[in-house]
Amino acid sequence: LPALANIFETSIDLLVGMDTIRAEETRYNIHKKAVEYQRKGDYDSAEKTYREALLIYPNKPGMILGLASTLALKGNTDEAIELMERGLPISINEKQKSTMRATLCFLYLKAGYEDKANRLASELPHTRESREVIQPLIQRGLSEIEINENIKNILLGDGKGIW
């Protein structure tokens, strides 16, 4: 491997994918540290952690949205909105996107953009599609008839709208 790394002028870590694994671990630890600060109410430290991380990972949606969430908690509404609008389109984490969209509704409202808040809220998932509704049903052990009824309810909803 060292000879191969020399030929391609790269590191052994890069050849075997360790750099990617280390980067993921590093990003995870950054989030862990920042969220710990957030939960303690130390938003300044959480903000500093994310701002420093963005110097290394400027296009990672998790870092962008992490800073946005910290700023939202601090009350820095305008910058939080800007970062969420920047981070949401590039995020592939559906849970993260859902949480950020819901938060963004309230940030829009806080900033006086009621129309934007309503428009975004109308695109959020229905309660019937949430894990709080679906997981208890799964754990209850449904009959095939009940399963089919739930599929119908999710797909057709209350019958008042298309989606």
What name fits each language-model region?
Residues 25-56, 66:
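Alpha-helical segment of the N-proximal tetratricopeptide repeat
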Residues 37, 71, 108, 139-142:
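Residue at a conserved register position within TPR or TPR-like alpha-solenoid repeats
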Residues 1-16:
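Hydrophobic micro-packing sites on short alpha-helices
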Residues 58, 92-95, 126-129, 158-159:
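Short coil turns that delineate tetratricopeptide repeat
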Residues 28, 62, 95-99, 130-133:
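Start-of-helix register in tetratricopeptide repeats
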Residues 33, 67, 104, 133-138:
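Structural register within alpha-helical repeat arrays
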